[in-house]
Amino acid sequence: VSGSGIMAKRVVVDA
């Protein structure tokens, strides 16, 4: 997982 991918998943998990 790279920057963009981890960021997108992070947002979903955080939300």
Swiss-Prot record:
GO cellular component: ribonucleoprotein complex; ribosome
Organism domain of life: Eukaryota
Keywords per UniProt: Ribonucleoprotein, Ribosomal protein
Assigned protein family: Belongs to the universal ribosomal protein uL13 family.
Protein name, entry field: Large ribosomal subunit protein uL13
Lineage: Eukaryota, Viridiplantae, Streptophyta, Embryophyta, Tracheophyta
This protein's encoding gene: RPL13A
